[in-house]
């Protein structure tokens, strides 16, 4: 198959962030398929351009057999009108640039949210090229925006609500990485139109190495540093445990709350925690493997009523370290693995005690927990296993469309 994927925020492994579509594409290329990913190169969390266009509006490159087309879009910061302009720019340019490139016609087109305008562009091109159209829902807009506080009567929300229903109706198949997305999507389509395909982890990038005890006991967090991640709690835990000289905390990533965290650490005069810049996806494993505990936290929010499918969590699990899962999502992969620790979000006392409980274990006992988590992710959330599922879905849709 020749597969086109439209994901505004797709990344390659030399960038920091999730690489769902690159990872799927790499697996599909191994199986003889051709994959082209069309993305913007303005980074969604760093808020900066990561490619040099000079006077061009797009760039083409091939990364490990995966074709990328990068679309130049205007800069933005935060979630204001400039971000909407960035979304619309991507959509407009995709519809104008892609047909002019005279690429080999696709067999199937996937349009992936977060934002629905990218999915709309994929739908329009599927009509132009007479191919099946697969809609992928990675964030349920506009419901997520309403859950975050926007009025359901805001004109932008009303527009998104109309577009959401239109795209559900036009899609030949709907995929979501969220395990309970059908609780919402099922209001509009029948069950046979929907399939859950989780995020996962490329196990080639994160080898399991048994942890050896050292003179530092390290608790690490990697990824976005935003309001939803509530990392102030981890700084507070570092303050509570500062007398334990061999316990050290690391926060590695970027986001709107990073400066605030740095100032908080400085104000508290803490020497047992570092706030570090993000690293490329293919360098994350070094941080994970050097850690004793990996911390996953999300504030309690209705946004997670449809479950979570976190690339970061699956990376943690692949590293085979003890995980503290502090989230009230509808699903819990750590509980499913029957290993690791689950605590309430925003509960400092419970976090402090859980760290001390794990700290008091023998290294061999911590390694047993880590191995169990690793085996579970190999069986359930490896990109190889998930790609089997995606490949079958796409082949079935192409077959039905051409019958």
Regions found by a protein language model. Give the residues of each.
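N-terminal subdomain of nucleotide-sugar transferases
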Residues: 1-64, 179, 241-243, 402-403
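Membrane-proximal helix-turn-helix segments that form the acceptor-binding/catalytic region
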Residues: 95, 117-120, 124-128, 154-174
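Nucleotide-activated donor-binding/catalytic signature segment of Leloir-type glycosyltransferases, i.e.
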Residues: 252, 259-286
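Conserved acidic donor-binding segment of nucleotide-sugar-dependent glycosyltransferases
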Residues: 337, 341-349, 357-363
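Nucleotide-sugar-dependent
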Residues: 229, 276, 280-287, 294-317, ...
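Conserved donor-binding/catalytic core segment of Leloir-type glycosyltransferases
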Residues: 4, 212-238, 250
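Carbohydrate-associated surface elements
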Residues: 180, 197-200
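A charged, aromatic-enriched C-terminal amphipathic alpha-helix characteristic of glycosyltransferases
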Residues: 346, 363-396
């Amino acid at each position: 198959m020749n597969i086109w994927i439209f994901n505004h925020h797709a990344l390659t492994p030399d960038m920091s962030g999730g690489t769902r579509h690159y990872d799927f594409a790499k697996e599909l290329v191994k199986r003889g398929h051709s994959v082209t990913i069309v993305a913007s190169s303005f980074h969604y969390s760093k808020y900066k351009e990561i490619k040099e266009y000079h006077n061009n509006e797009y760039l083409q490159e091939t990364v490990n057999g995966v074709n990328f087309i990068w679309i130049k879009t205007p800069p933005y910061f935060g979630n204001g009108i400039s971000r909407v302009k960035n979304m619309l720019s991507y959509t407009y340019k995709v519809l104008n640039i892609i047909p002019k490139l005279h690429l080999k016609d696709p067999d199937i087109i996937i349009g992936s949210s977060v934002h629905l305008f990218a999915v709309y562009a994929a739908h329009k091109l599927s009509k132009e090229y007479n191919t099946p159209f697969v809609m992928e829902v990675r964030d349920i807009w506009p419901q997520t925006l309403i859950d975050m506080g926007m009025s359901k009567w805001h004109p932008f929300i009303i527009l998104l609500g109309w577009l959401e229903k239109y795209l559900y109706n036009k899609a030949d198949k709907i995929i979501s990485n969220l395990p309970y997305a059908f609780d919402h999507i099922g209001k509009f389509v029948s069950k046979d139109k929907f399939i859950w395909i989780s995020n996962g982890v490329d196990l080639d990038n994160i080898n399991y190495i048994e942890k050896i005890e050292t003179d530092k006991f390290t608790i690490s967090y990697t990824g976005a540093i935003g309001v939803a991640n509530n990392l102030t709690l981890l700084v507070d835990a570092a303050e509570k445990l500062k007398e334990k000289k061999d316990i050290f905390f690391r926060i590695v990533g970027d986001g709107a709350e990073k400066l605030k965290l740095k100032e908080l650490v400085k104000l508290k005069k803490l020497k047992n925690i570092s706030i570090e810049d993000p690293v490329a996806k293919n360098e994350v494993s070094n941080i994970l493997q050097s850690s004793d505990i990996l911390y996953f936290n999300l504030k309690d929010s209705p946004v997670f009523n449809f479950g979570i499918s976190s690339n970061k969590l699956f990376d943690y699990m692949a590293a085979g370290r003890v995980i503290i899962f502090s989230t009230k999502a509808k699903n819990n992969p750590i509980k499913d693995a029957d290993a690791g620790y689950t605590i309430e979000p925003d509960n400092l006392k419970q976090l402090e005690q859980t760290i001390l409980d794990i700290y008091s274990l023998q290294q061999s006992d911590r390694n047993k927990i880590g191995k169990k988590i690793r085996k579970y992710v190999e069986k359930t959330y490896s990109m190889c296993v998930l790609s089997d599922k995606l490949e079958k879905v796409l082949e079935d849709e192409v077959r039905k469309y051409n019958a």
